[in-house]
């Protein structure tokens, strides 16, 4: 009798079981490796685009201000030059958008959300250069716009570009890399990797497909884009307000009151954005020449305002630490708030290529600081530091408007490096979100996407109605 099989030892049996378990686990995970590799590539490309865009905007702004500084002693030159330079830069952005890629106008985030549902096209070969150069123009002109919207849209389009270049055919790859690019773009814009992940999972929850592949891809893309950003810009917080004191427990009711105020402000702010967008559509009526002219006037106005009151224009990041430090009186803070609300509505509502994150965060900081100073005056026994309310307000307006409280909380904490304020942030953002929902307000980006899709269907119906009717005439001889 030949011994074809040998008796296994207990150690061998256990090792065999472990091997089978590992093989079953590996076989159960069907994540295509190519998607994860491409997610890393998307993150690198998006990070490089973000760094280039950020530095490009800074360079354009510096050159514009340098030219004005050279003629600062000549009033007859500095005022016309300020208007003309900003007007021309803005007109370049509006022209590129209106003539080559209308979907590159505005924030671009709703376009990515629509693309994730296969409802909006992704023409990356047009959108990336138009958004990049157009954004350099409008943001370089000093308009009240943010850099994060362009970065999110360029990131999402970079994901689709990688899909097309490497001919990835699966719907899973198309969706995962689009979401990866969007998350990587936000991460690179704010040096906030966790907020980038949460933004896609929370804000884009209606469009994002919660699968292991998509989640892994988003994580990898955010990691690589953040590494690229920090390689070029360092690891410091993007908004330096210093370490603020903890919020005492007996002051949490004030943060809840602040959240209630911001809930109402967020609903009103969104409604004003929609009305401003409709107003500009009535002004230009779809004529690109009128749109470019309007953009030039808005850009020139921002150029003049920069000379009169620089805090009323620009993205607002430079204003945030100044306001949070309590360098303005309550009256001046309210004046700046009203002025920036008007300029934000005009610049963003006109369809200029640029985001609204940064202006919104600045508005929240200003109003939050004013509230904090008021509380310090009326409740001196609490020893209130107004800067803590500035930080809470920064996230509260975002939470009320965008309806993504978790993203708002994490985003602000990552940007300011004040993680000890997480409890008042939660109270404020939750209060703002609940009040906004109670008042019937619509999330900003979802509402903009719905309006865009409605216009798309209306245009399609108009084209179909204008097509000549084909009559079925009987054929003779058959």
UniProtKB/Swiss-Prot annotation:
Placement of sequence motif Selectivity filter part_1: 106-110
Membrane topology designation: Multi-pass membrane protein
Intramembrane bits: 109-116, 177-189, 193-201, 387-401, 402-404, 405-416, 417-421
Cytoplasmic topological intervals: 1-32, 117-123, 167-176, 202-214, 282-287, 439-478
SUPFAM superfamilies for the chain: Clc chloride channel (SSF81340)
Site annotation Mediates proton transfer from the protein to the inner aqueous phase: residues: 203
GO molecular function, one term: antiporter activity
Primary location recorded for the protein, binned into one broad class: membrane
Site location (Mediates proton transfer from the outer aqueous phase to the interior of the protein): 148
Motif (Selectivity filter part_2): 146-150
Alphabetical list of InterPro entries matching this protein: Cl-channel_ClcA (IPR023861), Cl-channel_core (IPR014743), ClC (IPR001807)
Catalytic activity: 2 chloride(in) + H(+)(out) = 2 chloride(out) + H(+)(in)
Any one Pfam family match given in the protein's UniProt record, by short name: Voltage_CLC
Transmembrane segments: 33-69, 77-100, 124-141, 148-166, 215-232, 253-281, 288-309, 330-349, 355-376, 422-438
Disulfides per UniProt: none
Residue intervals annotated with topology Periplasmic: 70-76, 233-252, 310-329, 377-386
Motif (Selectivity filter part_3): 355-359
Record-level GO cellular component terms: plasma membrane
Cell compartment(s), UniProt: Cell inner membrane
Keywords noted in UniProt: Antiport, Cell inner membrane, Cell membrane, Chloride, Ion transport, Membrane, Transmembrane, Transmembrane helix, Transport
HAMAP family cross-referenced by the UniProt entry: CLC_ClcA
Biological role: Proton-coupled chloride transporter. Functions as antiport system and exchanges two chloride ions for 1 proton. Probably acts as an electrical shunt for an outwardly-directed proton pump that is linked to amino acid decarboxylation, as part of the extreme acid resistance (XAR) response.
Sequence similarity: Belongs to the chloride channel (TC 2.A.49) family. ClcA subfamily.
Subunit structure, as described in the record: Homodimer.
Name of the protein described by the UniProt record: H(+)/Cl(-) exchange transporter ClcA
Record organism: Yersinia pestis
